[in-house]
Structures are given as structure tokens and as C-alpha cells.
């Protein structure tokens, strides 16, 4: 949402986080006045992330109507979300395990 943060700053953060292959979370990604923001965000992310990156949408978190959907970044670009949605964009290590998005920490601790 650009209610408290200017869109230009959000764009820059998306670009840098995408380039660094961070897992990204978008809160309040759309509203009646901001319908195209998720598609614009996806276009920025697609500069560095593959179309097949795993993404998720959770709607109405912790409410009775909670729902979730796992999809690719390519599919996310054309998906409708609203102000009750939270969008998660995985990184190259993110995978689906038992219908959940999982991103390993990237290292292993081996006791000696």
C-alpha cells in the first residue's frame, strides 16, 4: 500500500529485494483505488525472478473466512486481491511441501 509509503519507494524496495532473491511479503496489495498495484509489483519482480517462483495469497488471516492459494509469480500477476489479502513471493529455494510454501534457511548445522 502506498498510503504511508510513496509508490516510488515501494518500487525501489521491490526491485532491490527481488535482485537479492529475498522472500517478499506484500500487505494490503490492492483496493478500489489501487487495482493495478499487484500487477505493477509483479512486473518489477519479474525483472529478476523467474515466472515459476512460488507465491501465495492468504485472505482474511485469522478470521473464519481465511483462505489460501499457492500459485506462480506469472499467475499472481493476473490474480485479483484486495485489502484483506497478504501476498507472499518466494525465492529460488521456496518449494511446496504438504500444500504449504516452505523456504529453507539455506544452511545446515551438522553436529560434530
Explain the meaning of each model-derived region.
Residues 1-23:
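Class I SAM-dependent methyltransferase SAM-binding "motif I" and its flanking Rossmann-like core
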Residues 19-112:
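A contiguous loop/helix-start segment that scaffolds small-molecule binding in enzyme catalytic cores
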Amino acid at each position: 500500500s502506498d498510503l504511508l509509503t510513496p509508490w516510488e519507494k515501494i518500487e525501489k524496495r521491490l526491485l532491490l529485494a527481488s535482485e537479492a532473491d529475498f522472500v517478499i511479503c506484500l500487505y494490503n496489495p490492492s483496493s478500489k483505488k489501487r487495482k493495478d498495484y499487484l500487477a505493477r509489483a509483479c512486473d518489477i519482480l519479474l525483472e529478476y525472478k523467474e515466472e515459476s517462483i512460488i507465491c501465495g495469497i492468504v485472505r482474511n488471516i485469522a478470521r473464519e473466512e481465511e483462505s489460501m492459494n499457492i500459485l506462480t509469480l506469472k499467475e499472481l500477476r493476473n490474480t485479483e486481491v484486495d485489502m484483506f489479502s497478504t501476498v507472499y513471493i518466494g525465492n529460488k529455494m521456496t518449494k511446496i511441501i504438504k500444500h504449504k510454501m516452505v523456504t529453507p534457511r539455506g544452511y545446515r548445522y551438522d553436529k560434530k
